[in-house]
């Protein structure tokens, strides 16, 4: 039996699942992650908190299914969209991550949309 872990780093929280190769769920864990809104239109998260929260979820999976966790063959990851996470040269987080739903550049986006057909240029509309 092959075992795998799936981890989803979502805007509202971290979710982890331990599954058997036939998609049978062995264990599930989730933990919320707070979104900071220091000003109107801002949406940020503490990227260091993501790491500790992932480990919390993995610890819960291990507590629920220790033998299965020891036999994991792979880990799949998914994450939120477009989070701007700034790191120094050692990998240390420099500031809270600016999330995909942060609206502080709304006016600039409107100007770009009016000047350029961004969907044709980039394949994505902000």
Question: Where are the model-predicted features located?
Answer:
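Intrinsic disorder/low-complexity segments
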Residues: 3, 48, 63-66
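Short glycine-rich, Thr/Ser-proximal phosphate-binding strand/loop in the N-terminal lobe
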Residues: 4, 9-47, 92-100
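Glycine-rich phosphate-binding/catalytic subdomain of phosphoryl-transfer
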Residues: 56-126
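Charged catalytic carboxylate motif
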Residues: 49, 53
């Amino acid at each position: 039996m092959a075992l795998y872990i799936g981890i989803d780093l979502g805007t509202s929280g971290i979710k982890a699942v331990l599954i058997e190769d036939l998609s049978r769920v062995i264990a599930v864990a989730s933990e919320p992650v707070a979104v900071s809104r220091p000003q109107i239109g801002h949406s940020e998260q503490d990227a260091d908190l993501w790491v500790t929260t992932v480990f919390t979820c993995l610890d819960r999976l291990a507590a629920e299914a220790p033998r299965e966790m020891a036999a994991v063959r792979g880990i799949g990851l998914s994450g939120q969209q477009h989070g701007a996470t700034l790191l120094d040269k050692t990998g240390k987080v420099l500031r809270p991550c600016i999330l995909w739903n942060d609206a502080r550049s709304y006016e600039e986006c409107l100007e770009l949309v009016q000047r350029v057909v961004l969907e044709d240029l980039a394949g994505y509309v902000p």
